Every structure is written in structure tokens, then in C-alpha cells.
Amino acid sequence: MERREPTQKALVLAGGGARGSYQVGVWRALMELDWHPQIITGTSVGGLNGAMFVLDLYETARDMWLTIRSRDVMELPEENADLSALHQFLRRVVKEGGMDVTPLEEIVERVLDEDALRAAPIRFGIVTVEQRGLRPRELTLEDIPAGQVRDYLMASAACFPALRARQIDGVKFLDGGYSDNMPTGLAKTMGAEELVCVDLEGVGITRPNLTGLPTTMIRSYWELGDILHFDPDTAKRNMELGYYDTLRAFGRIRGCAYAVDSGADSSADAEAFRAAFDAVQKEVREKYPVTLTAAAALLLARMKDAQLAPLEAAAEDAGVDPTHFYTTRTLAQAFLTACDKERMESFTPLFTGSSTAGQAALAALLPNTFLQALVWHTLTASALPEVTEDEGL
């Protein structure tokens, strides 16, 4: 029997500045899933992360993202600068064509070994753009002259006009996001047969994926922060989101906004919760049709897991932390702990049939809050026995 060559897998890393910490969480999950790419392509911060991934520098990447701040990446005005000093700084930035990124360049110089990158078994490619004429350049390591890999990585991340264009051999280059912020086409050109794409919803041009290749898209439900605000706490949060989103994309957990156990017990609880929720909602809707706005709010929520959708939407509105792993029960408990109980109890007459027209109208005017109340009543009416505010996570 003829031996079949393994599928050529590619990891495609989009640009997105400080949101790049999310990709480190994705990488952690891919390692746990034993998913190893033969090709990595990236734009901007995706290229910088991708180079570290090629070199198997997970701990280095993680520790870097957990310590850097904006001042470690680019030149900024003094924190306590007066208005005059701030104006002077801004004038200089405009005159010089963007902020100086020497601090970032020093990090890249310290972390990335060009010889090791070229010797690595994973093929690597990046995207940048020539400033003159906005000519796109898709470059593999073989296309980049010896000694210039760091220069081209910095060019791919030159987010002009906020950051300065990168000059290489007399040619000025800009961030690859000016051409292709998610270089799927480059991955296919390099021989990819299967893609995992990590989208940061950054600025720039994200072209449609026209490769025709099997593609797993990983994208956060949650906001990942400003693209030029580097902060360890945000980075830590983004890493957790990236980790769980990847496990979800590969079918290891369920949920949409939250990471929820997909095991038999948790799934049975999700089914029981949704059945009880639907019964409560149907009863209230028949008595007070005006409360249909809560159903509309649920339909508008970006939830793909139907059984968990009401609980996830309510948990989001109540401010439940999305960076933990939950079962259906512990997510319910977290919601009960986080919600405004006095506000929830104010809707009780709607569930007991003793509501006034004014209370029903209030529920209609506050569909998200009333959706929380529906979930709260469903849970406190023992849809999931033994779920209490004291149950540990």
C-alpha cells in the first residue's frame, strides 16, 4: 500500500497589535491538542508571534506578553507630561512619521535568532507592504536576504501612521495589514492543505478566505482591548480566552461566550435548564405578551449553543468572568452570585401572576434585565437541584 504523506497544516496568525496575546493562548491549546503545523504565516503581530512559535518559544512568548507594557513597545510621552510637553511630543511624532518602536525592536533582537528560525522544520511566511504604491509583499524566509529577518518582521508590524514606516535598503515598508491581515493565500501558496486561522479583528484589510481549504477559524466572542494598549492584565485575560476558544473550535468544550464542560453530566444539566427556562418563558409570555422583548433580546445575542444561550446571555449581562472553565452548574452558580438579586426579585410578580401593567411594561423596556430575571427564576425554582450561591466553582 502506498504511504500517504501527512496533511500539510498551516497556522495563520492575523495582525492586531496588543491583542496578539490572544494567539499565545491559542498556541497553548494547540500544543495540548497535539496539533502541530508544518507552515505558519502571519501579519504584523501575527508574524512576530509566529516567529516565536516556529522556534518553540512558548514560555518566552508567554512571559513576554505577561510583562510588557505600551512603554516597552514604543516611545510614549512621560505619564505626567504637561500640555506643552504633550503637544511637543505629538508634533515630533507627526514630523517623524509615527512613534519610535526601538523598544519593540530591542525585544525582537533579544528573542529571535535568525539562524535558528531558518533551520527550524516549520516553514514561515509574513506579509508587508511597500509604502510607495502600497505594493504588497508576501515573503517566505527563503525570500528574505540573510541578516534581514528581524527588519522584515518589524516592517510587517509597522502600523503606520501610528508607528513609523520601516526602511530596508532604501525602501519604506508598512504593516502587512494594509494588504492582507489574514494571510491564508500565502499559506496555500506555501503548500498548506488545512488551515487554522486566528483572527484578532484588528485594523486593516482582512480578505475573504478563497483558498477552498478546510479551515478552522478561531475568534474571540469578547473584546480583546485596544490594539496599541499593552497591559499584562489584559494579556493574561486574552491568553485564557484564546485557550478556551481553541478548545471550543476543536469540539473539546461547549458554550459560546463561556467555556463550559461538554461532558455527559454538564450536558444533561444544560438540557434540563433549557427545558425549564422555555417553560417559564412560555408561561410568562402567555400572561404578559409585552414581555416578548426578552425573547427578542435572546435571539439577538451572538450565541450558538441553544441550550446554554439564555444562561450565557444572562451571565454576560451580570458580568460573570469569561476566563474560567465552568460546568453548567458552576456557570449557573456564578450567575446567581453576580446578578443583582434585589432587581431580580422585583420581577417576581410576573412569575406569580400578580404583576401590574407597569411591571410588565418595565420588563418590556428592559429586555436584557428581564432575560436575567427569567434565568434567575428558572434556577431558583430548582431547574438544577442543589445549585446555590454557596456552591464552589
State the predicted function of each range.
Residues M1-T43, A51-L393:
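Patatin-like phospholipase
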